[in-house]
Amino acid sequence: MKKNVIIIGAAGRDFHNFNTYFRGNKDYNVVAFTAEQIPGIDDRLYPKELAGKDLYPNGIRIYPESKLPELIKKFKVDECVFAYSDKPYSYVMGISAIVNAAGANFVLMGPKDTMVKSKKPVIAVGATRTGCGKSQTSRRIIEYLVGMGLKVVAVRHPMPYDPDLNKQTIQRFAEVADLKKQNCTIEEMEEYEPHVVTKRNVIYAGVDYEAILKGGMTKDPQTGK
């Protein structure tokens, strides 16, 4: 019997967990995403083209996180998967209590079910919260590796502000014109410009990391050819 699932997120890790584990998985029915942190992301749709047309022909609705208890009851949810960072332990466990009180299991997914393989060597740069300096550190690492004569690109967590998430499946920024072509917000431009202007480096972003690693960088990641 299928389990009904809600994925609790902020338009990043939540989509990734779905893509790598739940998409195409007939043992589960993801009835909704909930969202925080990204303005305007709630009350939108994770489109069928990304969700999988066979199991999710209408896509998956994204709701405000504040509606979580009523969504659990409405959709008879079995499990809620918490899938975003930048929150303290007290907040995460608070959501866990809300989920359990509404009658569902609270789940944190591990790396075995969510990591994707790359054909290229990877250096991961992470931090406990926003503003710790991941971007600056990444650019310094790229500078060092380029100095060694290596070809390097960056892959960044998406900032899915565009209402049509299909447009943000795979994004490639190699020059300033790409920022305009992708209709980047000011926040996105602040992130991508130092790579393409100052460092002359290519940066990838997008909703589907696996598609980026498998399709977006199958040949020369610098040229995209």
Regions inferred by a protein language model and the residue ranges of each:
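Hydrophobic anchor at the start of a short beta-strand
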Residues: 30-31, 106, 150-152
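Phosphate-bearing ligand-interacting subdomains
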Residues: 47-112
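ATP-dependent carboxylate-amine ligase catalytic core
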Residues: 144-225
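Glycine-rich adenosine-cofactor-binding loop
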Residues: 3-24
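Walker A (P-loop) phosphate-binding motif
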Residues: 114-162
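Short internal beta-strands
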Residues: 28-40, 155-156
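N-terminal beta-loop-helix "entrance" segment that forms/cooperates
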Residues: 36-59, 163-168
